[in-house]
Amino acid sequence: MPLLLTGKKFHNDLNKNKCLAMFAPLEGGYETRLLRRMRAKGFKTYITSARGLGDPEVFLLKLHGIRPPHLGHQSIGRNGALGEVQQVIPQASELFNENDKDKLLWLLEGQVLSQSELESLIKICTSDNKLKIVVEMGGSRKLEWKSLNDYILNEF
């Protein structure tokens, strides 16, 4: 029985566009098959949710601070009015440990991202030649994808 999803067309489109908007059936399974195919082709992959991403460039690539949740009355003499800021390493830092491999960042629940956040993801792809990004933008009856640029032009 032949493979129904070899990943060749997906791989070619990903290399050509660098940033793809993906629409997959809601029952799932397609993203893991494609991730497995991309790993076999030499990509280092990282999958995460787009919820709570904030500024994508800072959150994914740079050292940034976060504030812990407010847990009731605390003294402000020690930390000031805004509270303590903890430094956090970039979420996708493990992708950038190896410079020789192509990198694939897969974002789930991408429909919550605004137009400016999607444009920021495209800028990240153009600045780093080895980085490719796939953003799942919602469900569909069949697996389909298009360039993130085309998606932004048509949807917003």
UniProtKB/Swiss-Prot annotation:
It is a peripheral membrane protein. Keywords: Membrane, NAD, NADP, Plastoquinone, Quinone, Thylakoid, Translocase, Transport. Its EC number is 7.1.1.-. It is an enzyme of class 7 (translocase). GO terms for cellular component: plasma membrane-derived thylakoid membrane. It comes from the Bacteria. InterPro entries: NAD(P)H-quinone_OxRdtase_su_N. GO terms for molecular function: oxidoreductase activity, acting on NAD(P)H, quinone or similar compound as acceptor; quinone binding. It catalyses: a plastoquinone + NADH + (n+1) H(+)(in) = a plastoquinol + NAD(+) + n H(+)(out); a plastoquinone + NADPH + (n+1) H(+)(in) = a plastoquinol + NADP(+) + n H(+)(out). It holds the Pfam family NdhN. Belongs to the complex I NdhN subunit family. NDH-1 shuttles electrons from an unknown electron donor, via FMN and iron-sulfur (Fe-S) centers, to quinones in the respiratory and/or the photosynthetic chain. The immediate electron acceptor for the enzyme in this species is believed to be plastoquinone. Couples the redox reaction to proton translocation, and thus conserves the redox energy in a proton gradient. Cyanobacterial NDH-1 also plays a role in inorganic carbon-concentration. NDH-1 can be composed of about 15 different subunits; different subcomplexes with different compositions have been identified which probably have different functions. HAMAP family: NDH1_NDH1N. This is NAD(P)H-quinone oxidoreductase subunit N. It comes from Prochlorococcus marinus subsp. pastoris (strain CCMP1986 / NIES-2087 / MED4). The gene is ndhN.
